[in-house]
């Protein structure tokens, strides 16, 4: 029969062909080859060849090729490519994007006028706006007409045929530079040769979470896995989190230490973006991204020492033996699409929002160990990534073998002195990369009796979301889809994820009862303030007053956690409080988090309700801080517009809070001087560059002070320490805010 071997990219196509020749296996890269058609050769192609809107494997009006057997190698690495093929992304300069924008501009403006104006101006700092699901369902014919008009445009001709007839089951998202249309799930059955194959085989070394295989390839969650009996085949890895053991260790400290090791070993660093790659410029010029990754891998494999940086390349490459003795995962993988970034925003604070990122991290770890006898040290760095893995217990999302290897390395570190300097931590790494006999024995014994799981690890929510999509798209059974979603929502405990799932429920309810869909969306706001507002908006205000005395609040939040976890979270927050371009969202989120970590009620009204201040703190005794963040400002004076925003936020506070509540208006801006056209109120307080730096410095000192044995768990001692560093309400306003100046 017809057999196809499918890989993520052309680099691997060539690799498979070479290996097939060595093994004496006949292969071809053309579906027209007679040897393929008569079944004597295996067709080797990349994933884009199989899945595209003009695919000869099911999307042609005639002459489609059938497949009896399909094997997809490194299937987890193919997931993103398949998603891309089944979605449309058009730059805003394209006529298609302009027409789609004109169709929905009123809907976007009604959601968030500031974001709308930023997107209109092409401001790279702008957020993302998604067309309300009810409007997309109402206007699917108009949207279809636009896409049909441009169906031969190079930007959409390979994508549009796959989703053009299911636009009512799609999300449409706008950014400062593009519009993206993506279905709720992948209609994989469009590629008939794949859907109708007698055998479909999926190969992957990543077994920590198989949910995407269900959502993308529609794999039955009950299929059996064929895997090695034991996990000892993955080789020897020591996984270390230096900043989790000693939060005072900085990224710079780790970089300097790795540069030393690069004199003797190949050190490979995987970063999420080109921007983060710049951090490594002072220790290496060997930085490789998608455009030169093939040459980069060849260079790395030909060397035995040096430091190399790979940009956003967590899968699809092999660096065996001496080509990689230390692999470094620096930072959280970036979201791939606008919709993924929007989903991240919806799921802020929920562990469910980061599972796919954890899977990418594990894929990255695997680049440096390619056989049973191979070995490699793994360094996890970057405060935000360490905080997610360590504090949020996301390590539990790793595969069983990776969890075991992480546990063994952690046990080794516990044997060190309590100081755990960076030198001591890296001396632990030496056990692995120098193959200390005792360590090798420990490592092998740990995995010798550890078996792989025989069933797919698929989240129930993923299965239900897939079934709801199939019932609606394939059968038109919206009632059944809605029933599945309601049952899932009722079973979900995580409030943020529950609210997100209610948004998905409302999308299917819209087909059955639009009024109920709006009610569901309004109810979802009670669980998750990040999701879109219903048609009539939301008028409730978060009750921040349900907090205890400051030190007690901190103690209760971390009752079952240790001080290192608190310090890690605090480091993540204050590290992001910087005056810099394109950073206001991270700044506002971090300032909100700082308030929570200081034991205060903290929220982001403007982000939640599209009205009110950037950040609102409740500091006790009916007193609030109303804060506007202008950390991206570069002007020497504070503009009239900035001033009016803070005045407007104070007005919002007075209109929405009881008269016995008071607020302190605070402006965060590099300057303290208002423009002569501005009219600041007398009680305005300022946090400028000097004040912000003083605050961050004293927060770090506070963290060092509470790391002393016994302080963090002692409410009285913790309260005294807050007072010492002026981190109580009165101390904060007196020490870290200042008067403003006014231009005469």
Residues of each region from the PLM?
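Conserved Walker A/P-loop ATP-binding site and its immediately adjacent core
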Residues: 1-31, 49-52, 208-212, 270-277
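Interdomain/boundary linker segments immediately adjacent to catalytic/signaling cores
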Residues: 521-524, 528-582
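Conserved RecA-like P-loop NTPase helicase motor core
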Residues: 300-386, 633, 670-671
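Catalytic core segments in nucleotide and nucleic-acid processing enzymes
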Residues: 274-277, 288-302, 331, 355, ...
């Amino acid at each position: 029969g017809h057999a196809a071997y499918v890989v993520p990219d052309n680099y691997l196509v060539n690799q498979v062909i070479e290996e097939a020749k060595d093994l004496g296996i006949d292969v071809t890269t053309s579906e027209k080859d007679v040897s393929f058609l008569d079944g004597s050769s295996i067709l080797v192609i990349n994933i884009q060849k199989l899945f595209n809107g003009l695919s000869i494997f099911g999307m042609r009006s005639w002459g489609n090729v059938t497949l009896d057997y399909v094997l997809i190698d490194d299937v987890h690495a193919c997931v993103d490519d398949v998603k891309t093929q089944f979605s449309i992304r058009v730059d805003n300069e394209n006529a298609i994007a302009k027409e789609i924008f004109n169709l929905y501009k009123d809907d976007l403006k009604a959601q968030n006028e500031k974001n709308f104006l930023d997107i209109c101006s092409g401001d790279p700092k702008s957020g993302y706006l998604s067309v309300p699901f009810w409007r997309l369902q109402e206007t699917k014919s108009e949207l279809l007409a636009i896409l049909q008009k441009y169906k031969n445009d190079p930007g959409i001709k390979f994508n549009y045929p796959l989703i053009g007839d299911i636009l009512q089951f799609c999300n449409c998202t706008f950014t400062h530079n593009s519009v993206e249309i993506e279905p709720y799930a992948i209609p994989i059955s469009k590629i008939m040769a794949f859907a109708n194959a007698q055998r479909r085989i999926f190969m992957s070394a990543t077994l920590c979470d198989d949910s995407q295989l269900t959502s993308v390839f529609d794999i039955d969650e009950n299929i059996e896995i064929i895997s090695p009996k034991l996990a000892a085949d993955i080789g020897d890895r020591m996984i270390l989190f230096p900043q989790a053991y000693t939060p005072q260790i900085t990224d710079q400290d780790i970089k300097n230490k790795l540069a030393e090791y690069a004199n003797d070993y190949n050190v490979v660093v995987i970063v999420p973006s080109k921007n983060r790659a710049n951090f490594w410029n002072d220790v290496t010029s060997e930085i490789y991204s998608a455009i030169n990754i093939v040459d980069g891998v060849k260079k790395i494999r030909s060397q035995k020492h040096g430091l190399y940086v790979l940009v956003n390349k967590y899968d699809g490459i092999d660096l065996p033996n001496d080509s990689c003795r230390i692999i470094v995962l620096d930072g959280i993988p970036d979201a791939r699409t606008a919709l993924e970034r929007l989903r991240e925003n919806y799921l802020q604070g929920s562990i469910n929002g980061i599972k796919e990122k954890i899977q990418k991290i594990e894929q990255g770890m695997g680049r440096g160990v390619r056989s049973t006898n191979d070995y490699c040290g793994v360094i996890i760095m970057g405060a935000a990534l360490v905080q997610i893995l360590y504090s949020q217990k996301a390590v539990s999302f790793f595969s069983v073998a990776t969890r075991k290897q992480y546990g063994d390395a952690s046990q080794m570190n516990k044997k060190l002195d309590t100081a755990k300097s960076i030198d001591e931590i890296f001396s632990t790494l030496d056990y692995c990369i120098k193959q200390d006999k005792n360590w090798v024995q420990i490592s092998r014994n740990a995995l010798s009796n550890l078996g792989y799981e025989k069933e797919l690890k698929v989240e129930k929510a993923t299965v239900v979301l897939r079934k709801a999509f199939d019932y609606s798209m394939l059968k038109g059974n919206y009632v059944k889809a809605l029933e599945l979603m309601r049952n899932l929502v009722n079973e979900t405990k995580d409030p943020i994820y529950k609210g997100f799932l209610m948004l998905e429920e409302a999308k299917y309810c819209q087909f059955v009862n639009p009024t109920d869909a709006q009610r569901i969306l309004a109810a979802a706001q009670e669980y998750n303030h990040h999701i879109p507002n219903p048609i009539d908006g939301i008028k409730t205000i978060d009750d921040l007053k349900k907090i205890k005395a400051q030190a007690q609040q901190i103690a209760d939040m971390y009752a079952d956690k240790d001080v290192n976890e608190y310090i890690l979270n605090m480091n993540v927050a204050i590290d992001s409080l910087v005056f810099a371009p394109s950073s206001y969202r991270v700044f506002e989120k971090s300032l909100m988090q700082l308030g929570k970590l200081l034991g205060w009620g903290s929220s982001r009204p403007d982000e939640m309700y599209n009205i009110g201040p950037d950040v609102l703190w409740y500091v006790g005794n009916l007193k609030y801080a109303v804060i506007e963040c202008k950390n991206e400002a570069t002007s020497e004076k504070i503009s009239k517009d900035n001033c009016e925003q803070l005045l407007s936020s104070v007005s919002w506070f007075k209109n929405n809070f009881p008269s016995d509540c008071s607020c302190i208006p605070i402006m965060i801006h590099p300057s303290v001087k208002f423009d002569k056209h501005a009219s600041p109120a007398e009680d305005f307080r300022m946090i400028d560059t000097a004040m912000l730096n003083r605050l961050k410095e004293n927060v770090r000192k506070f963290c060092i002070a509470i790391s002393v044995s016994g302080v963090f768990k002692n409410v009285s001692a913790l309260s005294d320490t807050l007072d010492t560093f002026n981190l109580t309400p009165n101390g904060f306003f007196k020490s870290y805010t200042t008067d403003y100046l006014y231009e005469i």
